[in-house]
């Protein structure tokens, strides 16, 4: 019996040729989509951070990838400095609970002066001048910022997911 086999294997019955299970709304966590864009380019000014819509994510999945679901919000990407990893119009989930105090190599949303950016951060070994970081663009047409003082950068949160429209 397909249903029994699916239960035994811990998979959805649809993977074994059966009908797709209807999604259960109680298993979703609502994540706010903010009226903010993170620039993958010269920098976007974040003037308002109001919720304009919401996305629903599987509760178990979100708890597994985020520091805590309430720390997560979605924002849009603007610009091309992070191509091919991030494209203009992509939606990214930002975990604000995974920021400066847990900093490690990865893609982060950060604020430099008034500009909100999405960039790759690489930690440099602590030398005589203390801990430094490099802020990098994945697109080689854009410059990297090497040996930055972490005190000059506000780390907003780590990017934990990207969604994009398939043209």
What are these regions (language model features)?
Residues 1-7:
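Short, basic-rich loop-to-helix N-cap that marks the start of a DNA-contacting helix
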Residues 7-10, 14-88, 97-101, 127-128, ...:
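Short, positionally conserved secondary-structure boundary motifs
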Residues 94-95, 110:
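A generic structural signal for residues embedded in beta-strands
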Residues 100-103, 143:
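Short, solvent-exposed loop/turn segments at secondary-structure junctions
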Residues 111-117, 153-154:
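Short coil-to-beta-strand transition motifs
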Residues 122-167:
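Glycine- and charge-enriched low-complexity intrinsically disordered segments
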